[in-house]
């Protein structure tokens, strides 16, 4: 439908005035927005990148990762940092829990010499540091570990037992309003790690909730629920954990998918195991009995040996990773259980309770 010529002139004048006052790009037609193609950073897990639909976590957005204790939350964020650093990006870790282990971070591939780290005294200080780093435009990824440890100044200065109802939620709400726009402008990814609490007196539905009020749930473009589902054993020794991550909220692709992978103690996400499993599923790796073959060449007898081959031959692993990403991610948000490997859809209604945390 054609717009009246007078209206077109009035609209052009209004747009010109807005751009003059607020700067070029302050208003535009949606189809002209070059930022529609979202830049992403890998999570370090191929199946999780596929479940996210966009190939990783979106830059310029807020992400929340929550789960029970020892479920792999910090490990996952350290893998994100390692992936970002490999791309030459600058990363910062706001360690509000004062529990970051640099030796473990180094084992996961993090360049600790170039990782910015802060251990703030108060929640307000932590969030101000986040804002200052974002406004600098020089930091690409910021991790806050964790929301539960962001203690308001009034609570720290008060006595144990004093009531501070709603202080943390109000602090987070103010911070979200301030940070969201700055993150978009700077194209900085901000990841909040969060803990789980139980609602008292819930008879029906999910009694679990996350700390810090509701603001983070609304402002987050992606929310990931990470759970430990089992143990990995070598004989009697536990060497890792089976992990499931559910995409509870996703503003950049289809939500409610989930990914399953292994976290090995001292090594992090077992990416080579994922490559073997997904390669076999999508017929890039041939499996005959116990033998695995790639491009006609045998790479190992048994999954463990096939994984070791990929670990010792990073060029082959990178080639296989590239082929799988091209095959699975180009299907975009229409990924189905048959095409997503370890990633599969969840019933949106079944997960509605999680979304309402």
Swiss-Prot record:
GO cellular component terms given for this protein: cytosol
Signal peptide residue numbers: none
Region (Disordered): 333-357
SMART domains: AAA
Residues where ATP binds: 67-74
Top-level taxon in the UniProt lineage: Bacteria
Keyword Zinc-finger among UniProt keywords: no
Regions of compositional bias (Acidic residues) in chain numbering: 348-357
Keyword Cytoplasm in annotation: yes
Cellular location(s): Cytoplasm
GO molecular function, one term: ATP binding
Record key words, sorted: ATP-binding, Cytoplasm, DNA damage, DNA recombination, DNA repair, DNA-binding, Nucleotide-binding, SOS response
One Gene Ontology term from the biological process aspect of the record: DNA recombination
Similarity comment text for this entry: Belongs to the RecA family.
Function: Can catalyze the hydrolysis of ATP in the presence of single-stranded DNA, the ATP-dependent uptake of single-stranded DNA by duplex DNA, and the ATP-dependent hybridization of homologous single-stranded DNAs. It interacts with LexA causing its activation and leading to its autocatalytic cleavage.
Name of protein: Protein RecA
Organism: Pectobacterium carotovorum subsp. carotovorum (strain PC1)
Gene: recA
